[in-house]
């Protein structure tokens, strides 16, 4: 009986961590899309704000993600960092392109 309890507790823990990854992934995607929108509008400060929020969530998702989605999340995190760096230099076009790349990776991680 004890073994069954431990197995069920372990299964619940495994299932709950993937739910947390999905929540962070959804938030990262939302903020990355906002960053792209602000980039198209030409607003580097707002773009940087959303890119930083997306990066925070993508890093949190990466901690609990596994396998191929984790690779996409890590690539998205790298692109988001590039977007932040470029927007801090007021290079909106390059920052927008990096944010768009991050969105592509985040969407691929959901599949």
Spell out what each predicted region is.
Residues 1-7:
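Bacterial N-terminal signal peptides that target proteins for export
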Residues 2, 13, 17-111:
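Long, charged/polar, soluble alpha-helical segments
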């Amino acid at each position: 009986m004890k073994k069954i309890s431990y197995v069920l507790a372990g299964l619940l823990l495994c299932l709950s961590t993937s739910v947390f990854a999905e929540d962070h992934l959804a938030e990262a995607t939302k903020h990355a899309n906002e960053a792209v929108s602000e980039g198209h509008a030409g607003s580097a400060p707002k773009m940087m704000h959303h890119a930083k929020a997306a990066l925070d969530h993508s890093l949190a998702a990466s901690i609990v993600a596994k396998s191929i989605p984790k690779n996409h999340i890590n690539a998205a995190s790298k692109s988001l960092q590039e977007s932040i760096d470029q927007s801090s230099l007021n290079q909106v076009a390059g920052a927008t392109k990096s944010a768009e790349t991050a969105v592509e990776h985040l969407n691929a991680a959901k599949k």
